[in-house]
Amino acid sequence: MSTRKLNKVMVQPVNLIFRYLQNRTRVQIWLYEDVTHRLEGYIIGFDEFMNVVFDEAEEVNMKTKGRNKIGRILLKGDNITLIHAAQQEA
């Protein structure tokens, strides 16, 4: 058995969002009061209030799986519940 100590490192939310921005990772954002829709696109800017500038944004209907291209948008941080890397489409 190994005697190595496992170090747990806390990742700050701003660092993760910045990594998504730097790596141009396609992300999905869950909306606060609308569970039937999510937004997918690329983060190209954000601020300390988690207001996000989103490029190539698409609105995804979770019931029908339909997609609506909406382009570049500014999403207020108050509307964001969760941000994660979007799954690659097959």
From Swiss-Prot:
What name appears for this protein in its UniProt entry? Probable small nuclear ribonucleoprotein E
Domain Sm: from-to ranges: 14-89
Gene Ontology biological-process annotations = spliceosomal snRNP assembly
Q: Which organism is it from?
A: Caenorhabditis elegans
Q: How is this protein organized at the quaternary level?
A: Core component of the spliceosomal U1, U2, U4 and U5 small nuclear ribonucleoproteins (snRNPs), the building blocks of the spliceosome.
Annotated compartments: Nucleus; Cytoplasm, Cytosol
What keywords appear on the UniProt entry? Cytoplasm, mRNA processing, mRNA splicing, Nucleus, Ribonucleoprotein, RNA-binding, Spliceosome
Family membership = Belongs to the snRNP Sm proteins family.
Function summary? Plays a role in pre-mRNA splicing as a core component of the spliceosomal U1, U2, U4 and U5 small nuclear ribonucleoproteins (snRNPs), the building blocks of the spliceosome.
Tree of life domain: Eukaryota
CDD domains in UniProt: Sm_E
Cellular compartments per GO CC? cytosol; P granule; pICln-Sm protein complex; precatalytic spliceosome; U1 snRNP; U2 snRNP; U4 snRNP; U4/U6 x U5 tri-snRNP complex
GO molecular-function terms, A-Z: RNA binding
Grouped into one coarse class, the protein's main location is nucleus
